[in-house]
Amino acid sequence: MGVYTFENEFTSEIPPSRLFKAFVLDADNLIPKIAPQAIKQAEILEGNGGPGTIKKITFGEGSQYGYVKHRIDSIDEASYSYSYTLIEGDALTDTIEKISYETKLVACGSGSTIKSISHYHTKGNIEIKEEHVKVGKEKAHGLFKLIESYLKDHPDAYN
């Protein structure tokens, strides 16, 4: 088994407290509302929303994937950090055992810097290259931009 790590960083005009509330704490409600083509439904299968919680994410019609299940590994509202691991679903191919994600929002001027790290745990001697994860990174960034746009259009939301 190999582990391949990829990092991504981008900025936002939105402060980390608002972004964290929308992008992490209320994502299960907000994303299906503003981007049903991306995520149709998010539901908690086990747990209370904290570490150890298992969620099922059902993707929107036209997505190349049907669903994934992920486990929340950590969530820290004080440091605006969140980590979770994909543990089941058709995004995990026969070559990938699991994918772990770490996200941290950091204050940057009046906005934020979003730092994301993904760890792909492969089966056997399979190698994951940056170009293999590029499409997923672009989709995640696009979804983030939708949330950012929603927050700009709704300045009283998630304060």
UniProtKB/Swiss-Prot annotation:
GO terms for biological process: abscisic acid-activated signaling pathway; defense response. Keywords: Allergen, Pathogenesis-related protein, Plant defense. One of its GO terms (molecular function) is signaling receptor activity. Pfam families: Bet_v_1. The record marks 11, 31, 58, 113-114 as: Crucial for IgE recognition during allergic reaction in human. One of its GO terms (cellular component) is nucleus. It comes from the Eukaryota. InterPro entries: Bet_v_I/MLP (IPR000916), Bet_v_I_allergen (IPR024949), Plant_def-hormone_signal (IPR050279), START-like_dom_sf (IPR023393). Belongs to the BetVI family. This is Major allergen Mal d 1. It comes from Malus domestica (Apple).
